[in-house]
């Protein structure tokens, strides 16, 4: 069973993504939620997360910073950014941390 983390400071976005993934993956993964980068890193460490879906703009530690810290410890964790920022500079940063994908909000189920 995969261990997946959703980190987004917007509760509605986080809950909708959680519900969508839970329904579509039906027991194939355990899903954890974080409302900021600090909490995401704590959950990552404690739960041995394999897939991290990160918003970029979060209070405190942002998604890029969280991804950088994850990469320092884990080269295999699958990192996906789900963000409203469509600027090239953010996409470039996602590439530098070897993110698997960079998806824009709003997203479709």
PLM-predicted stretches and their roles:
Residues 2, 29, 77:
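Switch/coupling loops of ABC transporter nucleotide-binding domains
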Residues 2-12, 17:
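Conserved acidic segment of CheY-like receiver
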Residues 7-8, 34, 52:
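Conserved sequence signature across two-component system core domains
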Residues 16, 20-24, 43:
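Alpha-helical interaction/dimerization surfaces of two-component signaling modules
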Residues 25-31:
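A generic structural motif
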Residues 31-38:
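Conserved Asp/Asn-Gly motif in the active-site loop of CheY-like receiver
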Residues 41-109:
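CheY-like receiver
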């Amino acid at each position: 069973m995969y261990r997946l983390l959703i980190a987004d400071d917007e509760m509605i976005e986080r809950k909708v993504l959680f519900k969508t993934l839970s329904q579509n993956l039906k027991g194939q993964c355990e899903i954890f939620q974080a409302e900021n980068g600090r909490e995401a890193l704590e959950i990552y460490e404690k739960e041995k997360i394999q897939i991290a879906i990160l918003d970029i703009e979060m209070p405190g530690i942002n998604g890029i910073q969280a991804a950088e810290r994850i990469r320092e410890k884990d080269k295999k964790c699958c990192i996906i950014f789900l963000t409203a920022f469509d600027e090239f500079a953010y996409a470039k940063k996602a590439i530098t941390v070897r993110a698997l994908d960079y998806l824009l909000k709003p997203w479709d189920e």
